[in-house]
Amino acid sequence: MFEKQYDVIVVGAGHAGSEAAAAAANMGSKTLLITMNLQNIAQMSCNPAMGGIAKGQIVREIDAMGGYSGIVSDTSAIQFKMLNKSKGPAMWSPRVQSDRMRFAEDWRLKLEGTPNLDFYQEMVAGLIIENDKVIGVRTSLGLEVFAKSVVCTNGTFLNGLIHIGDKQFGGGRAGERAATGITKDLIEVGFEAGRMKTGTPPRVDGRSLDYSKMTEQPGDDIPGKFSYSDETKPLSKQRSCHMTYTSNEVHDILKEGFDRSPMFNGRIQSIGPRYCPSIEDKINRFADKDRHQLFVEPEGWNTVEVYVNGFSTSLPEDVQFKALRSVAGFENVKFFRPGYAIEYDYFPPTQLKHTLETKLVEGLYFAGQINGTTGYEEAACQGMMAGINAALKVQEKDEFILKRNEAYIGVLIDDLITKGTEEPYRMFTSRAEYRTLLRQDNADFRLTERSYNLGLASEKRMRKMEEKKDKSLKFVQYLKDLSVVPEEANPVLEKRNSSPMKQSDKVFKVFSRPQITMEDVKNFSGVEEFISENELNEEMIEQTEIQVKYSGYIEKEKNNADKLNRLEDMKIPKNFDYSNIKSMSYEAREKLKKVQPATVSQASRISGVSPNDISVLLVYMGR
């Protein structure tokens, strides 16, 4: 069978659980991954894609930390796009369309090749907790397995309830049963629980679609990739997606089913994701819009199954079908399966520490949708961080926390712990106040050394990052030292409608002009030779351009981050008594008592805590 004592047990093998198990095992902890179905490891339950706005940055951060999501996203990709390329580098976000079946298979194979990792297929029905400390899990068959740390990554399975029109039934995902027992155990020891909702669109037969009535959405001409490692290569061929629109006719058909919609008849009370609303929610909330975009996404290289992005719904199946048949290109559509909504239990994340360990039960960690987030990438990064900290706790080493100025992962976890969430939380670039520092191109600079010190990133990765960093810095310095005369620069400046130079200047300064590109700079004497002699690749050249163009913004954000970190270093004593600080607002006292922030900086980010409250706190702490 398997051993009965582990360092770390991970409950659930979705995106969070898979990264948690990989991190803990790769750090040397004897790890057991328990899932209800070993054939469904790392399933893409919703859209067949990884990355996107802010999410792509997270995948690159996971990769820089030695996680598997970036590598698997590359090996299973069918299309690559760098989103927001017309904006500044802080907004660039990589995204891949994925082969759903290959994604899950590649994840399974990566995990099977990971040392210190065992697998078991069973439902975990309870947690074994003694003296406010988790010591193991109990399965539905009554088997008890013990561990020093447990990571719960239950996804949408905790008391999951699926809705299609006026039909509802228990399930954690289409065709899979819900998980029961854990919520009851956690409430009994004092946890607060809530319910959330998410939804998914119909899957259809691509052979029944008329793509000539849609707009093709190809991948990038020169595709990139997620992983910084040499383990993966950019795509040599790609599959296109397509775009079409709903219409007033489609909306009218959908409205016919509103009286049977669980969203509108009160059957679903939970809050769904604000930024991924159902089609019925969209036409209800945005009644002035006569059409909505639909993205038609292939599910893989060889399958005919297609995902209808933008048509998430829990309306009756007959209404879904009739409405889709009125969409341009879908006149003869055949369904593979209808869309549905699912309600599930979650635990407000203010009950966690920044390590993702629960405050109530020692050694118990939560990651993913159990914390109120939505999205594969958000789940995966939490899983990785929970797995790292679960392993560190077992090894009696210092905890690992990423700050808001160090990673989007740090922003996400800090938001959850200090602000909580009452609706499914997803990441956006706008949530990160230091997004110029947290770009997708420099995640390796920010995180690889930290990961290497944890024992996750390999020596090879570390050397590769150092070479990229050294060579790009050397190129920046070369451009600062190199002068260019007006006779050489002005023809280039004139072509770009940039004002001419009157005297010699440094290439760095000329390059700083917004109109001037790296291709222009290569025309100046010595630049091409420097690139060739120093064997600079495209990544190093791009890094140099960003450092030159955005040096002012980067410096400003670094200074702001340094100020924040001074507050981050001001620790608040554990179990600090806020009730005696009468000059602080009542709301602030209540919020601080509930969240119990570890630092003054965290306290300042809690909703309802004003700058004046922080000043009072600092005085009270004798600062």
From Swiss-Prot:
Keyword hit for Cytoplasm: yes
Location(s), subcellular: Cytoplasm
MF-aspect GO terms: flavin adenine dinucleotide binding
Cited SUPFAM superfamilies: FAD/NAD(P)-binding domain
GO BP: any one term: tRNA wobble uridine modification
Transmembrane residue ranges: none
Residues holding FAD: 12-17
Cofactor: FAD
A GO cellular component annotation in the UniProt record: cytosol
Keywords: Cytoplasm, FAD, Flavoprotein, NAD, tRNA processing
Domain of life: Bacteria
InterPro entries reported in the protein's UniProt record: FAD/NAD-bd_sf, GIDA_C_N, MnmG, MnmG-rel, MnmG-rel_CS, MnmG_C, MnmG_C_subdom, MnmG_C_subdom_sf
PANTHER family, A to Z: GLUCOSE INHIBITED DIVISION PROTEIN A, PROTEIN MTO1 HOMOLOG, MITOCHONDRIAL
Descriptive protein name: tRNA uridine 5-carboxymethylaminomethyl modification enzyme MnmG
Organism of origin: Christiangramia forsetii (strain DSM 17595 / CGMCC 1.15422 / KT0803) (Gramella forsetii)
Gene: mnmG
